[in-house]
């Protein structure tokens, strides 16, 4: 076991602490010259474990120059870590400088850091990539000994992970002895992450350090005072019960799966906050100052509750939080664990959490998540080949720092795990794209960013391309947004341009915890004033969070195993029993499809459990095929668990609608004709550097960016359909926007194992998804009564009884 320097040993002793086993194991790995992946629960001291070898080295051999680079998924987390690191450094009187470098860092400080860096620099992948675009980067990183990647699960399987992996390959060239360290609490397959971290797949070079298990979390499902609702996915019915829990605890975080739901829940809680407890709201669309105020109030213990989204999933260390509430189903066991970890943030004390299911299917999902956490099961991560638009951006960044040869660049790129098997021909296509923009665009000087000289070295064609790159580099491409403002200029945050376009003067909507009335749109601003009138909720774009495959499998098994049912509330058991009597229950290895007439329409419900994204895609494809078959489809709705189509003519042969060739025919046509591919192209065009978001002193509006990318998209589709970025956009549209992998699995099941049940009326299991048809027709936030009436009528039909005279929400 590693010995600590006396000054560090004394610091632990003065606090009454003893270094944990995994913290010393990280020091052992460092002394053996090995990289390391640390997997340990929240509150186990992962951050200190990651930095401990660096502190020891700097105590034993003080040096100037950059020693340790820390990479975080969030700017706020980097700032938080700086504060936490400075405590032991100052208490031990160590001459170690720790600084952050993010988009919020001043240009003067950034310039100084390039010449005289601190010993420890805390940053994000995007800021690191920009730093590598400067000629000074070679000297700056030559002294680097360690890179520490926090919350690695938030990076590795994504485009940000591709960028970070490429950056690590460059850093390893500049500092050959650099060690790589990654930290996480929620890794399902450490072998995959060790391979990603190693770069070359040699996982034996990466030690796996596992922390001791902490106290088992205290998780419960909050049941309503009445019955579990048939429909909805928000848990809004439980506002009073949640408020009681807030009052009974010191500080609570109320997690919601969407920003719009966070606004609704905040309003619901405020309406029943009879004790006038201080409650805040935090999500990614709010103004930065509003988010920082909420974070500061939480850190100071001034709030009793904070309603939040995924913006607070990672790394927040507020020790006074003693309750986490998950509104609606958590969608994955890893996400639930991550959120539970926000409570107590101490290893030896159980984190307390409540799950508030939105409906009966979500009750099953909540129980599945609880069981998965208990069993130590994590959601699997899907690693894929590196994105080509990210590679194009990286090549441009390195060209800005120094000339390079093709052979050296290819070899270096292949040292990044996502690109380790990159074909030479594909690399040449990416290099050619950076050099000319592609065949159809090569006549335009603006796309000829790098040129090869007679000496075989590639250089940037003109200094303006370097400035252009640094202004526009980044992986996160936001949708076109408008700033929400009061007339006095105060900014509340941003909403999507599409939502703003649906509003007229005097329309109302909830935002930033306020009810707002639209006054008008001017330029990039949506002007509003406060109002007390009822309000809608902004609809935020992007894919919804789908249920994980692990939880979906557990829910399937619940349905198929009646011996599990005694664990469930009486009304959930009654629901499943009624389904078993009136139809059949879905089996894990079969695809149940029900058809039935209702009110002059013909319905088909498919219980596929592949998540909302895949179901949305399949709904579009199946209704297209129904149209071709002359079934006169009217529409469809999708949930995480099922798809329901409704048409004027009945479906008699569902197998024909679900054949696997739908991915070769209708899928290709649909994606190419829909806005999906254009949206994906917009993102890859910005990331790949084909279109700029910013010029010196001026930022393009979302509409201007969309116009530019749509124009180029049409040109390339016509004149160069094999263009690199069209290929990249197609891959994005398939994998991220349509979840084509899960779609394929669904169709494979359907190929041989469809169970078709033709019914005289709606089944009990179909009620939750059919209620969504009513939800599609009415504005969010104003539809509850209408939906309750619709749900009651459907329940009455499914159960074979007359509807109650007074609709019940349960």
Model-identified regions with their sequence ranges:
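Extended, highly charged accessory segments
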Residues: 410-413, 417-481, 495-496, 538-540, ...
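Short, solvent-exposed secondary-structure boundary/capping segments
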Residues: 522-539
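Helicase motor core with emphasis on the C-terminal RecA-like subdomain
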Residues: 1-14, 18-44, 49-456
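A conserved acidic, glycine/proline-rich C-terminal tail/linker
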Residues: 489-508
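Short, acidic/hydrophobic/Gly-rich beta-strand patch recurrent on exposed beta strands
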Residues: 483-486, 529
């Amino acid at each position: 076991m590693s010995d600590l320097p006396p000054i560090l040993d004394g610091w632990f002793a003065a606090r009454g602490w003893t270094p944990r086993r995994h913290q010393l194991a990280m020091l052992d790995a460092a002394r053996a010259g090995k990289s390391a992946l640390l997997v340990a629960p929240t509150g186990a001291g992962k951050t200190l474990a990651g930095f401990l070898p660096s502190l020891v080295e700097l105590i034993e051999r003080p040096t100037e120059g950059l020693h340790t680079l820390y990479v975080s998924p969030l700017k706020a987390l980097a700032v938080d870590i700086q504060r936490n690191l400075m405590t032991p450094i100052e208490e031990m009187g160590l001459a170690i400088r720790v600084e952050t470098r993010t988009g919020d860092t001043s240009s003067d400080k950034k310039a100084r850091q390039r010449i005289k860096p601190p010993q420890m620099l805390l940053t994000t992948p995007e800021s690191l990539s920009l730093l590598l675009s400067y000629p000074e980067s070679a000297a700056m990183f030559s002294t680097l000994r360690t890179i520490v990647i926090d919350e690695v699960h938030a990076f590795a399987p994504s485009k940000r992970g591709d960028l970070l992996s490429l950056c690590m390959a460059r850093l390893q060239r500049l500092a050959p002895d650099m060690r790589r360290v990654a930290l996480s609490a929620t890794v399902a397959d450490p072998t995959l992450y060790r391979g990603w971290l190693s770069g070359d797949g040699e996982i034996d070079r990466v030690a796996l350090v596992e922390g001791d298990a902490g106290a088992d979390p205290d998780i419960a499902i909050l049941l309503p005072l009445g019955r579990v609702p048939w429909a909805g996915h928000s848990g809004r019915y439980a506002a009073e019960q949640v408020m009681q829990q807030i009052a009974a605890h010191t500080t609570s975080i109320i997690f919601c799966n969407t920003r719009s739901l966070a606004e609704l829940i905040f309003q619901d809680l405020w309406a029943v906050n009879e004790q006038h407890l201080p409650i805040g709201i935090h999500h990614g669309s709010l103004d930065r100052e509003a988010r920082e105020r909420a974070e500061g109030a939480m850190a100071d213990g001034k709030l009793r509750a904070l309603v939040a989204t995924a913006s607070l999933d990672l790394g927040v260390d507020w020790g006074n939080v003693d309750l986490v509430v998950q509104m609606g189903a958590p969608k994955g066991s890893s996400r639930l664990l991550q959120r539970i970890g926000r409570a107590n943030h101490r290893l030896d004390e159980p984190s307390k959490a409540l799950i508030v299911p939105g409906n009966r299917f979500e009750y099953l999902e909540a129980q599945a998540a609880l069981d998965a956490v208990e069993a130590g099961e994590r959601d699997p991560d899907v690693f894929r080949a590196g994105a080509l638009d990210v590679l194009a951006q990286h090549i441009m960044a390195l060209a800005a720092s120094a000339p390079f040869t093709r052979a050296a660049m290819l070899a270096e790129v292949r040292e990044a795990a996502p690109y380790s098997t990159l074909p030479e021909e594909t690399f040449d296509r990416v290099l050619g794209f950076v050099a000319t923009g592609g065949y159809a665009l090569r006549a335009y000087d603006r796309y000829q960013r790098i040129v090869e000289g007679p000496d075989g070295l590639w250089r940037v064609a003109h200094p303006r391309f370097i400035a252009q790159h640094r202004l526009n580099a980044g992986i996160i491409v936001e949708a076109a947004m408008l700033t929400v403002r009061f007339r006095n200029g105060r900014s509340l945050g941003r909403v999507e341009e599409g939502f703003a376009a649906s509003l007229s003067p005097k329309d109302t909507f909830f935002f930033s915890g306020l009810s707002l009335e639209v006054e008008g749109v001017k330029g990039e601003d949506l002007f509003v004033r406060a109002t007390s009138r009822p309000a809608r909720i902004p609809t935020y774009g992007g894919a919804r969070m789908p249920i994980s495959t692990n939880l979906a499998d557990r829910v399937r098994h619940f349905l198929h195993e009646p011996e599990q049912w005694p664990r469930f509330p009486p009304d959930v058991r009654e629901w499943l029993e009624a389904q078993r009597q009136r139809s059949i229950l879905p089996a894990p290895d079969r695809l149940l499809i029900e058809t039935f007439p209702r009110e002059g329409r013909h319905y088909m419900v498919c219980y596929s459990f592949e998540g909302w994204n895949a179901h949305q895609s399949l709904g579009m494809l199946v209704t297209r095929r129904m149209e071709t078959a002359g079934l006169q489809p009217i529409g469809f709705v999708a949930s995480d668990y099922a798809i329901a189509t409704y048409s004027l003519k009945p479906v008699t042969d569902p197998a024909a609608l679900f054949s696997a060739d739908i991915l070769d025919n209708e899928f290709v046509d649909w994606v190419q004709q829909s806005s999906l591919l254009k949206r994906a192209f917009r993102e890859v065009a910005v990331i790949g550097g084909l279109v700029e978001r910013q010029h010196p002193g001026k930022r393009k509006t979302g509409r201007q960016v969309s116009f530019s990318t749509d124009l180029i998209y049409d040109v390339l589709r016509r004149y160069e359909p094999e263009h690199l970025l069209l290929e990249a956009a197609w891959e994005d549209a398939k994998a991220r926007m349509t979840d084509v992998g899960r779609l394929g699995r669904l169709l494979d099941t359907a190929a041989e194992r469809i169970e078709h049940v033709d019914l005289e009326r709606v089944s009990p299991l179909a009620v939750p998804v059919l209620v969504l048809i009513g939800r599609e027709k009415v504005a969010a936030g104003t539809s509850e009564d209408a939906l309750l009436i619709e749900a009651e009528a459907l329940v009455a039909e499914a159960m074979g009884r007359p509807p109650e005279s007074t609709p019940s929400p349960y």
